[in-house]
């Protein structure tokens, strides 16, 4: 996958994308379907970029119940919202299909490189935008779940989907 097609590298040239991945000391790894890609309870401090495949960010509660927090497809990021949280929850990422993942440590993104290049600033801005979009999505989720009846929840959800699609015909995520 071309890194320039990833939201984190929006408005960064192809040459600078390649250079920044070297500057970030990015490492690539392949995972078979069903494998644990990253366990944030044990190993935090890494941002993952899905280059191929589909992965799920999962939280396990004290009773062993699993909740899918997010599904991440090609070009998607995971771990960006856990960057500076000091999270101790049982959160991990699993491969839904065979996956190729590129890992970058938070320190490599948050600290300026010795070159102080403009593309590093752009990537940092993109990361903040992606985190903001994710926070907005979570607030929308709270808005839907705070409705009293199932009917009101569905209407609220459908209205949000229509707003995002900017039309009254839209696709619902997690459906075929």
Positions of the model-derived regions?
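Cyclic nucleotide-binding regulatory module and flanking cytosolic helices
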Residues: 1-33, 82-83
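Cyclic-nucleotide recognition modules
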Residues: 24, 70-128
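Amphipathic, well-packed alpha-helical segments that form the structural scaffold of globular domains
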Residues: 25, 132, 136, 155-163
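Cyclic nucleotide-binding regulatory domains
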Residues: 35-97
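Basic, amphipathic alpha-helical hairpins
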Residues: 112-120, 138, 161-169
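Long, hydrophobic or amphipathic alpha-helical segments
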Residues: 124, 128-131, 135-138
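Conserved phosphate/pyrophosphate-binding and hydrolysis machinery centered on Walker-type P-loop NTPases
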Residues: 144-151
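Phosphate-/nucleic-acid-contacting segments
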Residues: 150, 157-176
């Amino acid at each position: 996958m071309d890194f320039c097609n990833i939201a984190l590298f929006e408005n960064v040239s192809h040459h600078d994308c390649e250079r920044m991945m070297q500057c970030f000391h990015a490492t690539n790894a392949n995972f078979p379907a069903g494998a644990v890609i990253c366990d944030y309870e044990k190993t935090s401090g890494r941002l993952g970029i899905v280059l191929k495949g589909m992965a799920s960010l999962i939280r396990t509660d004290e009773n062993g119940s699993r909740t899918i927090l997010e599904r991440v497809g090609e070009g998607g990021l995971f771990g960006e919202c856990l960057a500076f949280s000091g999270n101790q929850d049982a959160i991990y990422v699993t491969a839904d299909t065979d996956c190729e993942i590129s890992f970058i440590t938070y320190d490599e993104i948050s600290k300026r490189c010795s070159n102080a290049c403009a593309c590093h600033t752009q990537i940092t801005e993109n990361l903040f935008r992606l985190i903001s979009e994710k926070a907005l999505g979570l607030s929308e989720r709270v808005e839907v779940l705070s409705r009293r009846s199932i009917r009101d929840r569905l209407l609220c959800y459908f209205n949000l989907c229509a707003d995002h699609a900017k039309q009254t015909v839209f696709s619902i995520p997690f459906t075929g």
